Amino acid sequence: MLAAKVQLYDFFAATVDIFGDMPFSKACTLPLTNDVNGSYAPYDKAEDIYRTILGELKEIAPRFRLVTVPKNFSTQDFINLGNMEKWERYANSLRLRLAMRVATQGALQEEGRAAIKEMLENPAGYPLVEEQENNIFIINQKSGQLNFTAGSGLGDWTTNRLASGAIIDRMLSHGNYDMNSSDPQSGVYIKGEDDPRILLNYNPVSITNRQTGQVDEHRYLGTDLTVADELTEYYNAQAQDEVNTANKGFSQITQRGFFWENDKFDMLIMASPEIHFLKAESYEMGYGVAKNEAKAEEEFKKAVSQSITLYYYYDSVSTGENARRYNAPTAEETASFAAAKWNSTEYAD
């Protein structure tokens, strides 16, 4: 019952984020009362739902240390396979996630910051998802209800798998490919300087540069609404995918590689990089805890490093023909990139 509550609250909080006020405290009574008229539940305020969930998670998490685990629970539990420590970390981490959402403004600001303070100042009492082995996920069963091979649907919706120029701008120091640019490195990935996750996400393209007459190879070309229609049409017609040669146009999400159609890709519910990003923001902004630039930097670097490691882990276990095309960055290279991102002022909004 405790595990079911955690999963329910995770789902419900996400639903509240989308829709706001919802039936909650008096919802789903029909199976219990058989009263149709009484089953039309009133709407609870979003703030009240969040307040309830934050309080419940605080109460639930430590109980996983004391609960007697039923013999058959490990086979019934398709999330954590009966691991009570992971359920405790899941509950605490979900509470941190939700507390951060309300810590900046609104009626629950004080409650959110108090929860953050309580957890971050007592890590032994409130263990979090902080390492890859703590990640919360459902294993892809490849058949039945738990068959969710990553990227299902991308094959039917071409525009949904095109790279975004804005994302590429953030991942490459020389930005999204621009044929009109005087920068010869436009759209080029530079090892040791750029985000190595782009190699697993998107296919590079080759295209004849109308300005120089030369073929620009290994370029990352994302969609950009600010580009003139005529040039967009040229990109669509002339850019050649270097991985899937049947594709023309903008860089696309890599198929049968790290993510799309990788049947080894788990359904991630909560991953350690997110928790370190949340902690970094807490220390940087002083949400619940005293501002601490050194701790914020440490947590940010952990988040970036662990994210890169996670990407390359799923690439390494993929059985697709487009997986493992690139060597994973070394720990030193990953740390250097994370440090460069922390020190960058390019996107200091």
Kindly give the residue locations of the regions a language model identified.
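Structured, solvent-exposed acidic/aromatic patches
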Residues: 1-315, 345-348
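Long, compositionally biased, charged low-complexity segments
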Residues: 234-235, 322, 337
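Conserved small-residue
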Residues: 302-334
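Acidic, glycine-rich loop-and-strand cores that form catalytic or ligand-binding grooves
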Residues: 333-349
